[in-house]
Amino acid sequence: MCRVFMIAGTHSGAGKTTLSLGIMGVLSKKYNVRPFKVGPDYIDTAYHRYVTRNFSVNLDLFMLGEENLKNLFYKNASRADVSIIEGVMGLYDGIDTTSRGSSAHIAKLVNVPVVLVVDASSMAASVSALIMGYIYYDKDVDIRGVILNKVGSERHYTLLKEVIERDLNIEVFGYLPKDVELELPERHLGLLPVYETENLDKKLEKLYGYIENCIDVEKLMNLTVKPPDFIEKEDRVLKEKKVKIAYAYDEAFNFYYKESLETLEEMGAHLIPFSPLDDERLPEGTEGLYIGGGFPEVFAKRLSENESMLREIKEAVEKGMPVYAECGGLMYLSKGIRDLEGNRYSMVGVYDFEVVMTKKLQRFGYVEAEITMDNVLFKKGERIKGHEFHYSRIEGFSQNASYIVNRPGKEEKWECGFVHKNCLASFVHINLYTYKEGVKRFLDRCSSFGRK
């Protein structure tokens, strides 16, 4: 049996992330906890890793598909003492107006019980009606119990617990009191990243104290499921010589899916982290580059001042080194970044365009793309799925676009996936786990470059 449960909320802001981090952190003191996150979010998963010391796995139905999602879940859950899935938005909120891809959908897909987080502030008997609605909206969702958040006092909790247990045959695992010090700071893309959150350890210690005193975590450990027979597919490529791939990893660039990095390694890559902020040179013997997303706009001044790294990457691209960059990586490879105050910071300059930060969200949500020309990952005619989320736009000439992008079911289309020599940069985030043929092409190009 697998000890596993999902922490889902009645709505965004109910407190599921705070409770997920607290419960993961407390259980990690005694157990090997494997965290998961429904949806494509990078920032929440970084917090998961911080409190559990284990990479978090994204369970995104749109990008992975059902079989890949189930395989990833059971593969990782089978290696842990307990697995905890943090949901996304409200329990039944999925793609567009449906529940497809929602926390509820994923819970049913991988057959796990749900613990519902309820914002109980200023509520009494109404809390039962609210919970009842979530239980009966879809009876196939296995809601085993609730945790009450923003509770006014112990007396308030006692009243709420009595009402719920009187009206509903459901477990009340505990509560969190109202405390503004538990709130994590936010910015334009969601939570402030782990790297930038002040007094995080102090906040977490206070949270852990509440969890240990107010929530029955041992009862949560009794939530189990019988996993299906699982046989892990062997994708590892046995090569005497690994392909050396340097990937940008620091405060400015850290948006990577665990499965993307693992896929690269399984297909023959030797991954070497480097810092565009602090390192002067690329790692010795680098044969290819992977520059993920992040917040280069926040660190634009420091990035622009590291001129030796800017030159190093520009020269490598011009020599034909294969490079794949997503979102923040695209911004870094542009001529420059202009912030909201109009300040301009020079970047690598592989592409002729600049990236301008905007107050208005430019793109948000799932996208599909048709490949219109061969590049280092994809062949013309192939289709890919991903997501975009950025407050920035391109200004200037956009050369050699190899993607035609659209939102599923929408008519609007736009170009992306810009190609220069063996460099591909796009605003679209993808999960490389689903594109192993593309990874093989990329690594083959890198290997060929290394032999020159």
Swiss-Prot record:
Q: Cofactor(s) for this protein?
A: Mg(2+)
E.C. number(s) listed in UniProt? 6.3.5.11
Q: Which residues form the active site?
A: 327
Ranges where the GATase cobBQ-type domain occurs: 244-437
* Matching InterPro entries: CbiA/CobB_synth, Class_I_gatase-like, CobQ/CobB/MinD/ParA_Nub-bd_dom, GATase_3, P-loop_NTPase
List the catalytic activities from the record.
cob(II)yrinate + 2 L-glutamine + 2 ATP + 2 H2O = cob(II)yrinate a,c diamide + 2 L-glutamate + 2 ADP + 2 phosphate + 2 H(+)
Question: Which keywords, in A-to-Z order, does the entry hold?
Answer: ATP-binding, Cobalamin biosynthesis, Glutamine amidotransferase, Ligase, Magnesium, Nucleotide-binding
Question: Which residues are annotated as site, described as Increases nucleophilicity of active site Cys?
Answer: 429
Per the record, the GO terms for biological process are: cobalamin biosynthetic process
Q: Which domain of life is it from?
A: Bacteria
A molecular function annotated in GO for this UniProt entry is:
cobyrinic acid a,c-diamide synthase activity
Q: Does the keyword Protease apply?
A: no
Which pathway is recorded for this entry?
Cofactor biosynthesis; adenosylcobalamin biosynthesis; cob(II)yrinate a,c-diamide from sirohydrochlorin (anaerobic route): step 10/10
User: What family is this protein classified in?
Assistant: Belongs to the CobB/CbiA family.
Q: What else is known?
A: The a and c carboxylates of cobyrinate are activated for nucleophilic attack via formation of a phosphorylated intermediate by ATP. CbiA catalyzes first the amidation of the c-carboxylate, and then that of the a-carboxylate.
Job description of the protein: Catalyzes the ATP-dependent amidation of the two carboxylate groups at positions a and c of cobyrinate, using either L-glutamine or ammonia as the nitrogen source.
Q: Which NCBIfam families match?
A: cobB, PRK01077.1
For domains, the record's comment is: Comprises of two domains. The C-terminal domain contains the binding site for glutamine and catalyzes the hydrolysis of this substrate to glutamate and ammonia. The N-terminal domain is anticipated to bind ATP and cobyrinate and catalyzes the ultimate synthesis of the diamide product. The ammonia produced via the glutaminase domain is probably translocated to the adjacent domain via a molecular tunnel, where it reacts with an activated intermediate.
Protein name in the entry? Cobyrinate a,c-diamide synthase
Gene name of the record:
cbiA
